[in-house]
Design a protein with these regions (language model features):
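Short S/T/G/P-rich N-terminal loop/turn motif that feeds into the first structured element of a domain
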Residues: 1-69, 73-87
Length: 87
C-alpha cells in the first residue's frame, strides 16, 4: 500500500465504501490494484490503497463529479503517500 486517506464522512463510512466500489467498477481500478477501508468510529475512516498510477488516480479523484460527491456527502480528508519500511 502506498496511499493513505484519513478523513470523515457525514453520511457514514458505508456510503463511502459503496462509492469506492462504484468508482473501482467505473475505472479507478486502472490506477489502484488493491484497497482497504476501515471505519474508525464517529464517521471517521482510513482508506489504504496500492496506487499504480498516481497521476491517473489524482486526475480521477479531482473530477467535478468526485468533488461534488465529496461536498454533497460531507467527505473531508487528507491524502498521504507511504512507502514500506524494511529491515
Amino acid at each position: 500500500m502506498n496511499m493513505c486517506i484519513l478523513g470523515t464522512i457525514a453520511t457514514g463510512v458505508e456510503t463511502l465504501r459503496t462509492r469506492v466500489e462504484y468508482n473501482m467498477e467505473r475505472g479507478a481500478s486502472k490506477y489502484c490494484s488493491e484497497w482497504k477501508l476501515a471505519d474508525t468510529g464517529n464517521n471517521g475512516f482510513v482508506w489504504l490503497g496500492n496506487i499504480t498510477d498516481m497521476e491517473g488516480m489524482g486526475a480521477f479523484l479531482t473530477t467535478d463529479e468526485e468533488m461534488k460527491w465529496d461536498k454533497d456527502n460531507g467527505c473531508v480528508y487528507k491524502l498521504y503517500t507511504m512507502s514500506e519500511m524494511s529491515e
